[in-house]
């Protein structure tokens, strides 16, 4: 049925970050402004080949030329480009932080009863994958895993659950995210049949109690919005966790990102580059880069490739990977 005769989807190998073929370590502060500018121009040209998502009307109407980049570490910004005051929704970039929230509040032993930690080679919204796995989500970076986790945020209502998560995230990361009600209305205007099927299958198999509550909470979380400074602070929280967050908890989240943060291309990309990433269909990539000082890459550019990952941010990461292989 797709997972093997003797396979148990709940058998989870306790994770560490998988090792890339050659760990990319570089001093990004040594890169000249001229080199950054050359890479940014080339990446933005590649983005002309991407497409805007059509299944969320408001995202299909954004300016495909929008671009913003911050790369830096706990000591500050190394390089900045584009319009960093642009606002955008997190969409699937919220997933690592939902995973972090659940691990922080519930712990791994509870969480592994609800979601798995294996990569998937099917699309992020695959109902077929969930059916093959008996309703047990493959990992927390695909829609089934995130919808499942959203169903377990404390709160009696959708609004209370979203507010509980948002308050925690803004406080912990010291950012100023907000719920974009116009985008949420746009999401509701064109219901997603795959996500609906996923939510009902999760409920039928007992992984969530209420399909509607889980799905609508997930929709609100995806519509949390901010600017590049907020995205950078979220990355800093993963790279340099401060109490009460535990380093082993953020390490577990980053290990999942390495396996599944870019969906089908995740493991191959990580093994080639050493970069740990999470993308969102709004045009975001948040990446954790190994360096003498743990580095954060936060980039916004709306056009997507066929897998649903933003073209320009991926191109920039490829340029950085090539740089690190030579230095």
Curated annotation (Swiss-Prot):
Belongs to the glutaminase family. Homotetramer. One of its GO terms (molecular function) is glutaminase activity. Keywords: Hydrolase. One of its GO terms (biological process) is glutamine metabolic process. This is Glutaminase. InterPro entries: Beta-lactam/transpept-like, Glutaminase. SUPFAM superfamilies: beta-lactamase/transpeptidase-like. HAMAP family: Glutaminase. Substrate binds at residues 92, 143, 195, 218, 263, 281. It catalyses: L-glutamine + H2O = L-glutamate + NH4(+). It holds the Pfam family Glutaminase. It comes from the Bacteria. Its EC number is 3.5.1.2.
